[in-house]
């Protein structure tokens, strides 16, 4: 890494020699080279950006100097209008300078990213050419620090040598399971007819890579997702949860079909499949909320940027000796604050709406798949309840609704199992049972309170919210058990 950062031209020769001397270290060496080359490329672009920023600031200082001269002249003459004009001109220059610096920095970041990818791809390609036997390890190492460059190299190699594409995928995944996603994407782009075979090969040598591969298959090749998932499941049965979850995260629309196919092939995997989908559903909901939060922040920032010039000018006008100008400035600032507050309120409202919709979607997806898995393997109900409570408590209500619909005779046991596995999921679980099976509400609440006494208050509150008429009776039964 140090050599690559200091002298990128010599880095490939040094790194290749190191990798040839210690093949087991090829991935680590490649990661270091990729990191170092990227640092060097970014440093060069950053230097250019800094120079451009200095020129922007120098130009702004010149304009501000001219305005300050006008300011001094206006002060001496006592001209209120000229003074206000000078202050406004300075505010405009400062605002324009800030915008120019933001634009320059953004362009610099984009240029730095492009330069780092180009430089990394070039030097890593040279390493592979000089040490082809370590190609997979070199790519896997590169992916750890610069996945975009690694993906570019992999796709080029697969297009030039399709016969070795499957083996390359397996070798990359074995060296770095986290690189399975880029390998899957590359083979879909270059040799889609080999994608199923490649994903199975990756899962066989690196079960930890199966989830990422399944996610990419579902997203980019949904028509092959089911067959690929079953091939991976056969190669790595222990990865069933990750595979089902990957499919659900990559493309929720095909999750049910794929999960059913997987369960039909191996009913014993039903609990793992249901859990994997529940975890993915919860993650999808969290991602949607995060996206809504980022969008809301961007909208507020856009409003603030649109008001920046007016705010800057108004702040300058506050120094005026003319009370009318000061009053107008104060009104402008108050209006700006109101507009920003409105944007913030609208953002919070949008976030809340997305949170509700995302949570409902997650509950529905997790519940639908859990129900299908219970039908495929009725003996898996308790295991599904336990694993979901532990791994995806945010979907507990949806899964308990599935229990109530598919296996109501196991609802009390499943609810108690959930509470025992994760008391934090108890409230949502008992609320679902109370709404779906009110005749079992008391029995379920008591069983859950026995399994998780620390969650008794949450259980009682959830019951009261779901069925106020029965709350007193259920609370009394819970109190008797506690006593």
Give short role names for the model-derived ranges.
Residues 1-483:
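General marker for long, soluble alpha-helical cores
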